[in-house]
């Protein structure tokens, strides 16, 4: 068991490190833009979320590449591990380029719907336009991430993110504030810096690919028609899953903002409390996500070796590790919520609203880890359609309608909505555990 734990951690730790570094960069970004005032911060905040939603679909390529690369590695077809990566890079170019041009034209019409404040719109529109121009690079970067994770080279993913973040912070300093002879572009400079840094990451990934993936067929040949269809079959469900998951966050905040409470000030406090609880949760679940991606690779490799029982065992082994790690990480949220919330919230009433939901998250995050690991394990086995159906159905057909009923319908407030949130995540974990135990995923051909 010790050897298996080590195998999991060798893949998972660089992924967790990379994801954590992304969150740290977001905080640095916020601090640098925050010095420009509330309008600039609101422009970047709204623009960042809109960009997350715009990019969600193309990031689905990562799962398709990882599933195929890990399967080929397990099959011993080392000369073909990077062929799916070549196909995904072409798809990222063919979809990302026209889509980014269309979005560039749509941003001035869409942004005022998200935030009607003219001062925010003035800075937010060019910020978001700069970000969407990086769509091709985002699609390619996620394709590379899937490949490195699939062939147990996740440390290259971490290394590239650190290069990107260093470039982003330097470019922020130059373009936001006008150093080294550049014009002071303010919030727009943050968007341009992020876009350039994303392309820097793509360039670095290509250099790493030439060094570490040529023997796997990198830039040597494209998949045949069946191979391209396989990438689409695996990537499309994950793309829709990512898109609906991101959109669900938007709907959740709308529900909380429209909860029937005594006055607008209380509604605003509930939105602020929810925002902090959600952001703390998103950081806390990173180890679970990293372990899930490790499970996807190990499951794919075992299936490639024609050893479905070992694949099944990998799923349960990573679940045990994930549940234990996440339960320990949840204890501070459960036992000392005010210490965590006090960093972000300074109004006593808002902190009071956030305390109960954060405790709930702390108490149940170990169960959530089970769902995260097995969802990714199923994707790694090629069952991305089943993963999509469960995720979208439980979020959109169950949780969001119940949240609307509890909030705007009955006016029960944030604690009731968060009880529904952790209950739906628990149900999702149970369904994924049932699907994993059932084992129909063992016969999927990739």
Give residue spans per PLM region.
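Short alpha-helical transmembrane segments in multi-pass integral membrane proteins
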Residues: 1-12, 69-136, 167-170, 182-236, ...
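Residue-level signal for short hydrophobic patches within transmembrane helices
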Residues: 5-24, 28, 50-57, 133, ...
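Transmembrane helical elements of multi-pass membrane transporters/channels
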Residues: 10-26, 130, 164, 197-201, ...
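Transmembrane alpha-helix boundary and packing residues in multipass membrane permease domains
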Residues: 15, 19, 30-31, 48, ...
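Hydrophobic alpha-helical transmembrane segments of multi-pass membrane proteins
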Residues: 16-17, 53-57, 94-97, 131-133, ...
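Helix-terminus/linker motif at the lipid-water interface of multi-pass membrane proteins
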Residues: 20, 24-42, 111-118, 174-185, ...
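Small-residue-rich hydrophobic transmembrane alpha-helices
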Residues: 41-101, 138-152, 156-157, 253, ...
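Short runs within selected transmembrane alpha-helices of multi-pass transporters and secretion channels
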Residues: 62, 66, 131-149, 157-165, ...
